[in-house]
Amino acid sequence: MIFSMLRKLPKVTCRDVLPEIRAICIEEIGCWMQSYSTSFLTDSYLKYIGWTLHDKHREVRVKCVKALKGLYGNRDLTARLELFTGCFKDWMVSMIMDREYSVAVEAVRLLILILKNMEGVLMDVDCESVYPIV
């Protein structure tokens, strides 16, 4: 029963009108994905993280990128992120130009983890877009 409730919770809270609730939800989904990867590191939950990469509020985007850093920082989990990475890589690369400094910094840190832990995912052109920033 609890697992059933937890399955429905992200769907409701990731679309909440309050950015604070969306940020908390994404942060917790990231924790669940790391702790209970067999149940939560799936496309049905990763889509919420992908959607919030585009959120209009800075704090939500920061929490989203930090959640992704936790996942991409664990080599055991990166193989399960291949489809997600293929879908959202271009957006993650473009986030280094985010108007909010904190989001851009976290995006660069995320790309460094992707470069280290997922060989061949970031192309030269992706890396070249980071060089002027750093």
Curated annotation (Swiss-Prot):
Q: Where in the cell is it found?
A: Nucleus
Name of a matching Pfam family = SCD
Chain ranges of the SCD domain: 10-95
Q: Which InterPro entries does its entry note?
A: ARM-like, ARM-type_fold, Cohesin_Scc3/SA, SCD
Q: Does the keyword Plastid apply?
A: no
Q: What is its main location?
A: nucleus
Which keywords belong to this entry?
A: Nucleus
Q: Which GO terms describe its cellular component?
A: nucleus
The record ties this protein, via PANTHER family, to: COHESIN SUBUNIT SA-3 (PTHR11199:SF8), STROMAL ANTIGEN (PTHR11199)
What the record says about family reads:
Belongs to the SCC3 family.
Q: What is this protein called?
A: STAG3-like protein 3
Species of the source: Homo sapiens (Human)
Q: What is the lineage of its organism?
A: Eukaryota, Metazoa, Chordata, Craniata, Vertebrata
Q: Which gene encodes it?
A: STAG3L3
